[in-house]
Amino acid sequence: IYYLSQDEENDKKPKGIFSSIEEIEQALEDKSISLHSKIVSIFKTINSEGKSVTEKYTSTAGRFLLANVLPKNHNIKFSLVNKLLTKKNVSEVIDTIFRYCGQKETVIFCDRIKTLGFKHAFKAGISFGKDDLIIPKTKENLISGTKKQIEEYEKQYADGLITRGEKYNKVVDIWSKCTDTVANEMMKEISSAEKIYDDDRIETNSVYMMADSGARGSQAQMKQLAGMRG
């Protein structure tokens, strides 16, 4: 779901105008557009009087696919899925549908979005490789700086300026700060890392997608793999 809702930030100009979800699916099959390509298409829903209405939007192909499985209700807007959908955001979408459409429509929606998610997760082929774990360039400098500071604490302790307990607390504190800084630097680099494929597709780092979406893993686990221990 996260992958489907991603947006190509550099893609400013729409790559086509489509009058139906079938046309979008055909274009995806032909590879004339990608899931993350900006396009112009329509969102069919109903108004407060129960009459069918058609709204035009500029968004990604993936988000139009997500909008297609939304229940028809005047309170369920296209904006509900017109954003990057993390695990938390998907929960909010389900909650909104439950409040306005009831249990039956919510169950149907969950089943549809599950099928859509599995289908495109399979097609995306997102995997976990060692090259996806990016060690921050600043790691060595941060660690060496921390070690120098610890040497200073050792000197202060030897000179009787601080107690053993104070030295211990200072060492723990500075290693904790170093760990957090390395983790933040790693997340900054991994979030901007991209893969460019032979067909000119540009994909976000797989490990970052897994953690940021809330599907699997966390920043703390990534910190251990590519930050302090890795």
Ranges and model annotations:
Residues 165-226:
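Gly/Pro-rich turn-and-neighbor structural signature
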